[in-house]
């Protein structure tokens, strides 16, 4: 298996790397720097937000294809907000749907997703057998992970998202961008989030970033054997 794990920032990438005993090496490719681990794992701090994450992931996918060793799976991983009470701080969520929370248009009758306008997609579905296996291995709860360009900071916005996306368990800023790039290359995608804060009013004192990063490291350690043994045709 050749795997790409895309995080937003370097502290998340480093949390993933700590799940592996062997050190990695830095590999430069046009526009990106990969942290390459043994056994076919490449880690990428892809940047914050869906656009930057999509661009960086696409660059990594293209470089791998040109090198003659395309990726078999792309994983969007990191910390994120959790919708209480289903996804409390410190818990894990694995996406059974990766959804753009706000890609569409506002109308007098409410929000219309871009698909209702006749364009694109708003949801990518990771392989269901892989989602189940990941949930069993890590204890993560499967559910929708939303991607937005703006982090929720009010109770009103959190309630609106819950109304619009009833199956949502977590919110982050990169998963949909990573999934769009993977889909363009025909590569399956998975998203794993460790919950660092509740989705709702912005209260930095309530954030538990260190706890979430530790949970991410632990989860990746448990997930690695599942991913390494997974066959891409098992979709």
UniProtKB/Swiss-Prot annotation:
SUPFAM superfamilies: Purine and uridine phosphorylases. CDD domains: futalosine_nucleosidase_MqnB. It catalyses: futalosine + H2O = dehypoxanthine futalosine + hypoxanthine. InterPro entries: FL_hydrolase_MqnB, Nucleoside_phosphorylase_d, Nucleoside_phosphorylase_sf. GO terms for molecular function: adenosylhomocysteine nucleosidase activity; methylthioadenosine nucleosidase activity. It holds the Pfam family PNP_UDP_1. It comes from the Bacteria. Disruption phenotype: Mutants require menaquinone for their growth. Coiled coil: none annotated. Pathway: Quinol/quinone metabolism; menaquinone biosynthesis. One of its GO terms (cellular component) is cytosol. Its EC number is 3.2.2.26. PANTHER family: 5'-METHYLTHIOADENOSINE/S-ADENOSYLHOMOCYSTEINE NUCLEOSIDASE, FUTALOSINE HYDROLASE. This is Futalosine hydrolase. It comes from Streptomyces coelicolor (strain ATCC BAA-471 / A3(2) / M145). The lineage of its organism: Bacteria, Bacillati, Actinomycetota, Actinomycetes, Kitasatosporales.
């Amino acid at each position: 298996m050749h795997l790409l794990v895309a995080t937003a920032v370097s502290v998340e990438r480093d949390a993933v790397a700590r799940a592996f005993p062997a050190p990695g090496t830095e590999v430069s490719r046009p526009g990106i720097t990969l942290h390459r681990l043994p056994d076919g794992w490449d880690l990428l701090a892809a940047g914050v937000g869906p656009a930057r994450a999509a661009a960086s992931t696409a660059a990594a996918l293209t470089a791998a294809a040109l090198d003659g060793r395309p990726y078999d799976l792309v994983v969007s991983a990191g910390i994120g907000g959790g919708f209480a009470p289903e996804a409390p701080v410190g818990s894990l969520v694995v996406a059974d749907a990766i959804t753009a929370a706000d890609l569409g248009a506002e109308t007098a009758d409410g929000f219309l997703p871009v698909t209702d306008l006749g364009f694109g997609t708003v949801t990518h579905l990771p392989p269901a057998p892989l989602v189940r296996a990941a949930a069993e291995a890590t204890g993560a709860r499967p559910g929708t992970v939303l991607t937005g360009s703006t982090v929720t900071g009010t109770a009103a916005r959190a309630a609106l998202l819950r109304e619009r996306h009833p199956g949502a368990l977590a919110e982050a800023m990169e998963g949909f961008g990573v999934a769009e790039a993977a889909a363009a290359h025909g590569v399956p995608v998975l998203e794993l989030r460790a919950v660092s804060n509740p989705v709702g009013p912005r209260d930095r004192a309530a954030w538990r970033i260190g706890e979430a990063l530790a949970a991410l490291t632990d989860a990746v350690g448990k997930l690695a054997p599942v991913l390494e043994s997974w066959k891409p045709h098992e979709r």
